[in-house]
Amino acid sequence: MLEYPQSGERTRGRRNIQNQRASQPSKKRFTVRRIIGGGDLWITEFVLTYDGKPSYTVSIVEFRGDKVARETQYFADPFVAPASRAQWVERMDT
């Protein structure tokens, strides 16, 4: 099962997930920032770039045995850091 809570979509079944992902017309690129987890729960943080536009993405993957039982993905567009926080923060490479 693949869920996109932000758009309210749920895709069931491996073939449907494969077809849904293969049918996307955009050119995509993935840059993995980190993968953490253990046992039946793994989280991937990556930048998904569609046609040159980056989206910061978190993918939560739940396993049942050696198969993916559920993947939930969240997407966020980059934004300009406000000047009001500048004195407390340091800039990150993105």
Spans of features found by a protein language model:
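C-terminal and inter-domain tail/linker signature
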Residues: 1-94
